[in-house]
């Protein structure tokens, strides 16, 4: 069996959507496409993936329609919910390796990472990733932070060699439409000057990516879940399948 691919959604600061992207892509791969995944949450200040999992458990247990959908799904799905490990940048790799000694190795290990390039523990963790995906939004502050972070990784880690990083891509997230705007295209041109590039697929600024109806709607639905696949109706025009398809082409799984 081939070694797992280490994939990180990373940013210097919160708010760019890296945790949501981690949960969405991990869940789509695992629950829709049947690819075994492991998630390692490395942001010990808040552990967003834990919040997501805890929320999912409560919503599913307290919403009869979702509980029924959950039980029906696992009658035909021959895997368990993917595991989420909670670590620090210093311990993340060791914890993932220890887990894989006791359980079958996943195809992909997703790392949810936040921190500055000046943190040596974070630098050492990033250096062991195979692929990095950095969310970027049209907010000026977030955009500058994402570009600065990606440029530092490229110039100080990838270009000199010595890291395991094979490729780095920025991911346009929370933009006004499903197509790249003129601003996105302008920034993409600037990224080329830095030897960087973004994915072709973009995610629009839609509420479906960050929350669920839970028991509040007449027909309870769930899109971002760590325990179930996204609702099929909500998948329409979400561009999540396209994002995962492009990601799979890059990481070769």
Q: Model segments located where?
A:
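Beta-strand-loop-alpha "switch" segments that mediate conformational coupling across diverse proteins
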Residues: 174-223
């Amino acid at each position: 069996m081939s070694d797992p691919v280490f994939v990180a959604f990373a940013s210097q600061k919160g708010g760019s959507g890296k945790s949501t992207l981690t949960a969405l892509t991990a869940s789509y791969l695992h629950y829709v496409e049947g690819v075994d995944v492991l998630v390692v949450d490395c942001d010990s200040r808040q552990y967003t993936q834990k919040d997501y999992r805890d929320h999912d458990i409560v919503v599913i247990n307290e919403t009869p329609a979702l509980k029924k959908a959950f039980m029906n799904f696992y009658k035909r799905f021959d895997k368990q919910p993917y595991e989420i490990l909670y670590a620090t940048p210093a311990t993340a790799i060791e914890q993932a390796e220890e887990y894989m000694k006791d359980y079958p190795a996943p195809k992909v290990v997703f790392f949810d990472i936040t921190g500055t390039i000046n943190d040596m523990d974070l630098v050492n963790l990033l250096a062991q990733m195979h692929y990095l995906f950095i969310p970027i939004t049209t907010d000026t502050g977030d955009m500058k932070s994402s570009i600065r972070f990606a440029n530092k990784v490229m110039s100080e880690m990838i270009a000199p060699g010595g890291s395991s990083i094979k490729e780095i891509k920025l991911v346009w997230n929370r933009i006004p439409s499903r197509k790249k705007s003129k601003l996105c295209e302008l920034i993409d041109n600037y990224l080329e000057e830095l030897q960087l590039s973004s994915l072709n697929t973009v995610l629009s600024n839609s509420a479906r990516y960050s929350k669920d109806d839970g028991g509040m709607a007449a027909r309870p639905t769930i899109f971002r879940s760590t325990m179930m696949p996204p609702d099929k109706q909500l998948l329409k025009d979400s561009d999540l399948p396209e994002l995962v398809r492009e990601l799979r082409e890059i990481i070769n799984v």
